[in-house]
A protein has these predicted regions:
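FAD-dinucleotide binding site
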Residues: 1-441
Length: 441
């Protein structure tokens, strides 16, 4: 069986290795000049052996596939396990950096209101009997019409709780609250609830040396020449002999095609015959988050430990170099949703300047930065966004259709996984498609 895999990110590499090891004839077409896709560690911009993730960053203790890959390639997780309640620790507002005690003084109800916000989604999640099939929720049609913003309004959250709820949506889903389906949030909560049962408290960690160590390991397991770089697919024709995948002047024949890339570049691909209407609607319509990650390295660390939420342009500021022995450190500005889009419209140097100003407002003692980068995923045509976000109405319309085979066309990538939006989901989707193809050959 000859298979063309489009995309050399985690999903494509996972599928390619499994299919190759099972004896299939596999070619991987990658439009860029590197593997990994949105799993991308950048270190060339920094000194002292430090680096930061331009894309996906966290591997939770419940992400068993990713943990297995980390072990397989001789990597390790860092020692700084983080719980997601840490994002409430600091708030920069009106020129002041406020800690937990300050926040409690400003609004004694803040913690309770945020608990009510999360509690709503937990109650909906209780009706998600299988996180892989959220549309089977008894009230799926109702909850999928609601957005996270609708829930904020229904609960009448106060000013500070609204800010934290907004930043949570911008951070977790890379979108504004009105762009996130309440059913999608509930699906994610149900997934974590089920996964956490055998693992206890869910904590997140980074991979020492970066996630690119995993993608490099997977790529090295494939035969030389299997991955064809600089091959941008522009047409897929299906006839009685199979699929013909065109990338510029080159054409590749396949029995099966695995589309393991973001849906956004597929919107420019000519399919002959055209995709079925419901599938075409999903390919062209599914929402994508907009994250701009701006990492700046400073010669010394003059900031407190922990996440900081800000009303400024950086949205969330944290240190990805916690635990690194060097005196220097990196501050990350994580900007999602409309803020991420606004930054993406600027040149990289302008983005870095904007985030430096925002960080300096928070920490006036910051010395001049040594270097850095700003990665705006929504501004890159090969990706068109950071990761999928199912907007109101899209779970019931798009979830199932993207996870089914369509003749010889199969979709993989985090947008087709139960672990949507995560490195774990990319690996999961590659395994799922490979298993399906091998079961039916």
């Amino acid at each position: 069986m000859r298979i063309v895999v489009v995309g050399a990110g985690l999903a494509g590499l996972t599928a390619a290795e499994l299919l190759h090891n099972a004896g299939c004839d596999v070619i991987v077409l990658e439009a860029s000049n590197r593997v990994g896709g949105r799993a991308y560690t950048r270190s060339a911009e920094f000194i002292n052996g430090q680096g930061a993730e331009a894309g996906a960053e966290w591997v939770d203790n419940v992400h068993t596939r990713m943990r297995a890959l980390v072990e397989r390639f001789g990597l390790r997780m860092d020692d700084n396990a983080t719980t997601w309640t840490a994002i409430r620790r600091w708030l920069f507002r009106d020129g002041a950096l406020l800690g937990p005690a300050d926040l409690a003084g400003l609004d004694p109800q803040l913690g309770d209101e945020l608990d009510r916000f999360e509690g709503f989604f937990a109650s909906v999640a209780a009706g998600v009997s299988d996180a892989a099939h959220p549309a089977q929720h008894p009230q799926a049609a109702h909850y999928d019409t609601l957005s996270a913003a609708d829930i904020v309004d229904q609960l009448e959250l106060g000013e500070l709780a609204r800010l934290f709820a907004t930043r949570n949506m911008q951070g977790e889903f890379a979108a504004e609250p009105h762009e996130v389906s309440a059913l999608f949030v509930a699906q994610q909560r149900a997934l974590y609830e089920a996964a956490a049962t055998p693992h206890g408290e869910v904590v997140a960690q980074r991979i020492v040396g970066g996630v690119s160590g995993v993608t490099a390991g997977l790529a090295s397991a494939l035969p030389q020449g299997m991955i064809r770089f600089g091959e941008t697919v522009d047409a897929i024709t299906i006839d009685e002999t199979g699929a013909h995948v065109r990338a510029g002047a080159n054409s590749y024949h396949a029995d099966q095609v695995v589309l393991a890339c973001s849906l956004v570049p597929l919107r420019a691909v000519v399919f002959d015959p055209p995709l079925p209407p419901e599938l075409a609607a999903a390919v062209h319509g599914l929402g994508y988050g907009r994250v701009t990650k701006t990492a700046l390295q400073y010669p010394e660390r003059v900031w407190p430990a922990g996440y900081a939420t800000t009303t400024g342009r950086a949205q969330r500021v944290y240190e990805p170099t916690v635990g690194h022995p060097a005196e220097s450190g990196i501050l990350m500005g994580y900007t999602g949703g409309e803020g991420g889009t606004r930054l993406a419209d600027l040149a990289e140097s302008e983005r870095m300047h904007e985030i430096e100003l925002s960080q300096r407002e928070m920490y006036p003692a910051l010395p001049p930065p040594l270097g850095g980068f700003s990665q705006a995923w929504s501004g890159l045509p090969l990706f068109g966004g950071s990761y999928a976000v199912y907007r109101p109405g899209e779970i019931t319309r798009f979830w199932d259709v993207l996870r089914r085979p369509h003749g010889c066309i199969h979709f993989a990538g985090e947008h087709t996984a139960t672990w949507t939006g995560y490195l774990e989901g990319a690996v999961e989707s590659g395994e799922t498609v490979a298993s399906r193809l091998l079961a039916n050959r």
